[in-house]
Design a protein with these regions (language model features):
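Active-site hotspot residues in diverse enzymes, especially metal/ion-binding acidic/histidine motifs
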Residues: 1-327
Length: 327
C-alpha cells in the first residue's frame, strides 16, 4: 500500500489528508493480495479523482482524471496546474452530490437574474444566502461548500461544473458572513449565462472572484451577481455624507439601505468596504449585523446534507462528502 500512497502523495495529497479521507473500514492488508490491491487502487482513485490505471505498480506518476473541459482564470504567474489538486477534491465532492441529490435537475428553469430575484423577493425582503441556496437546490443544482483541502494546496474561490447531467456549484469561502452570498451568485451567473455549455461536462473554475472585473465571462458573471442581489448590474455604495462611517453607523445605514432597496445588508456593507477601501469598518459592521446568525458555511453545509437522498447514498460516499465539507 505504501507505493500507492506515495503516488497519491506525489500528486499533491499529503498523508494526513489521505488518512482523513480513508473510509472507516479501511485495512492496509488489502494490498497483500492482487485482487485486494486492485480494489484499493480503484477506491483510492475514486476518492482523489485519479486515473485507476495510474496507481498500478508498473505505471509512472499518478494522473488526474476529470470529465469535461477546464477553464482556469488565475493571477499572473499562477499556472493552471496550481489548481489541479483542489479541482480534484472539488470533483470528488461534486460527483457525490450530483449522483445522490434528492431533487431532479430542471434544465428549463429560468435562471435570468431578474426572474430569480423576482421569485425570491416574493418570500423575503432581499436575496439572502439561505434563500439563494434553496432556489438552486429546488432547481436541482447542488451547492457544495468544501472546507478541507490538502496542506499547502492552492484552492479556488468557486467552481461551477456539469456533473452527471446537472450543474453543481462548489464554494470554498472561509469568511463567516456575507462573502459567500456574492460568490454563490457569481457562480450561478456562470451557469445562467451558458458558460458551461462549451462541452457536455463543462467546468468553470474561479481562482479568485473579483467583483470589480468587467471583462469577458467574469464580467458577465459579476453583472449577473450584482443584478440578482441588488436589481442593478453595477452597484457602488457610497456614504451620503461624503464621510467614512464608523462600524455601528455603517451597520445601521446598511440595514436601512437594504430594507429600502431590497439588498441584503451584508452585501451593502461589503460593497461599501470594497468601493471605499474601508475594510476594518466593514468587517466590524458585519459582526454587528450577524452577531446572532449562523455562519454561512454551516448554512450551506446543512442545507446540502438535508437535500442529499439518504436512502440512495452509500456509506462510503456519505463519509467522504462529510469529511470534505467538514460536517
Amino acid at each position: 500500500m505504501s507505493r500507492i500512497y506515495q503516488k497519491i502523495s506525489n500528486a499533491g495529497f499529503n498523508q494526513a489528508f489521505i488518512n482523513k479521507l480513508l473510509p472507516e473500514w479501511w485495512d492496509e492488508r488489502l494490498a497483500e493480495t492482487p485482487s485486494g490491491k486492485q480494489y484499493a487502487s480503484l477506491h483510492l482513485a475514486r476518492i482523489f479523482s485519479l486515473a485507476p490505471e495510474s496507481l498500478k505498480d508498473e505505471s509512472g506518476a499518478a494522473s488526474f482524471c476529470f470529465n469535461g473541459n477546464h477553464r482556469f482564470k488565475h493571477r499572473i504567474n499562477v499556472g493552471e496546474e496550481d489548481l489541479t489538486v483542489a479541482t480534484a477534491v472539488a470533483y470528488s465532492a461534486a460527483r457525490i452530490a450530483a449522483n445522490n441529490f434528492g431533487i431532479d435537475y430542471d434544465p428549463d428553469v429560468n435562471l435570468e437574474w431578474a426572474a430569480v430575484r423576482g421569485r425570491l423577493l416574493k418570500e423575503s425582503p432581499y436575496v439572502t444566502l439561505p434563500a439563494l441556496v434553496r432556489l438552486c437546490h429546488m432547481s436541482g443544482i447542488p451547492v457544495v461548500y468544501i472546507k478541507n483541502f490538502p496542506a499547502k494546496s492552492c484552492k479556488m474561490a468557486g467552481m461551477a461544473l456539469m456533473c452527471s447531467g446537472r450543474p453543481v456549484i462548489v464554494l470554498t469561502q472561509a469568511k463567516k458572513h456575507g462573502f459567500m452570498l456574492f460568490d454563490l451568485a457569481h457562480e450561478l451567473g456562470h451557469i445562467a449565462r451558458g458558460h458551461l455549455k462549451a462541452s457536455d461536462d463543462g467546468v468553470f473554475v474561479d481562482r479568485k472572484i473579483d467583483s470589480d472585473a468587467t471583462a469577458d465571462l467574469e464580467g458577465e458573471a459579476n453583472s449577473y451577481a450584482f443584478g440578482l442581489l441588488s436589481g442593478k448590474e453595477a452597484l457602488r455604495i457610497v456614504p451620503e455624507t461624503g464621510k467614512y462611517l464608523r462600524a455601528d453607523l455603517l451597520a445601521r445605514a446598511a440595514k436601512r439601505f437594504g430594507e429600502e432597496n431590497a439588498v441584503d445588508p451584508t452585501h451593502v456593507v461589503l460593497n461599501y468596504g470594497f468601493t471605499q477601501n474601508q475594510w476594518p469598518a466593514a468587517m466590524s459592521a458585519l459582526k454587528i449585523l450577524c452577531s446572532e446568525m449562523p455562519i454561512d458555511q454551516d448554512i450551506v453545509r446543512t442545507m446540502l446534507m438535508e437535500d442529499i437522498d439518504q436512502d440512495c447514498i452509500n456509506d462510503d460516499d456519505l463519509e467522504l462528502l462529510t469529511a470534505l465539507c467538514g460536517a
